[in-house]
A protein has these predicted regions:
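Non-catalytic DNA-recognition/assembly elements of restriction-modification systems
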Residues: 3, 7-32, 157, 161-167, ...
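Sequence-specific dsDNA recognition surfaces
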Residues: 23-35, 49-80
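A short beta-sheet element
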Residues: 47-48, 67-129
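Short, surface-exposed secondary-structure boundary micro-motifs
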Residues: 86, 174-176
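A short glycine-rich beta-alpha junction/loop motif
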Residues: 103-109, 119, 142-166
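Acidic/polar-enriched heptad-repeat coiled-coil alpha-helices
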Residues: 172-173, 180, 187
Length: 205
């Protein structure tokens, strides 16, 4: 299944479309930079490690005290978190906000809010994860000794090719079907492994 996704990945995004700068199809914002709490109390905020697995992991968030403009930082369904400060290998890591996580946008990640009139948020998320885009991020990032970074302005200049909405919908539906099948296979494999371990334990009782 993964090889199938990789194969489709290289083809479906080569369709004709209109060239935009990324900053023209989404709002790009930096996160809240207030001090984080040592205790797990207050508002949950995203951190680099929150999206290290390419999806939101609520076990790896930070916490901050409530602040006046907090609602401006609350992540909404359709937002995309983008890792712009990381090692070169992980620069450009993203996570799609697919539901309300009651999570706020923290520092060291950029928040991309797509313009729904131009691009379907999930389509933009998929596009940012193509090899072509990931290789570009690795090429244009500023490389230091221990980490790399892409500033907000440079990211906004990234050229993306956006087809019409109907084409975007078809691609999103295809990928969603593939993702659902992958998750189903992972779950089935997990159940199989648990059953196998249980049977092995029973043999030695």
């Amino acid at each position: 299944m993964q090889s199938l996704i990789k194969g489709i990945n290289q083809r479906v995004f080569m369709n004709n479309g209109i060239n935009y700068k990324l900053g023209e199809v989404c709002e790009i914002r930096s996160g809240y930079s207030g001090n984080q709490l040592l205790s797990k109390k207050g508002l949950k905020v995203s951190r680099i490690e929150t999206i290290s697995g390419h999806k939101v992991n609520l076990e790896r968030v930070g916490y901050v005290a409530p602040f006046e403009s907090s609602e401006n930082y609350k992540l909404q369904v359709g937002d995309i978190l983008f890792s712009n400060i990381n090692s070169v290998e992980y620069i450009g890591n993203t996570a799609f906000i697919d539901k309300d996580y009651d999570l706020y946008h923290g520092m060291n990640l950029l928040r991309l809010t797509p313009n729904n009139m131009v691009v379907i948020p999930f389509y933009l998320y998929l596009l940012l994860n193509t090899n072509r885009m990931l290789n570009r991020f690795k090429t244009v990032c500023n490389k230091a000794v221990s980490q790399a970074s892409i500033n907000q302005t440079e990211l906004g200049k990234t050229v993306v090719q956006i087809p019409d909405i109907n084409a975007q919908k078809q691609i999103c539906e295809l990928y969603q079907a593939l993702y659902d099948k992958l998750e189903s296979e992972k779950y089935a494999n997990s159940l199989f492994q648990k059953q196998k371990q249980y049977l092995l334990r029973q043999m030695f009782i």
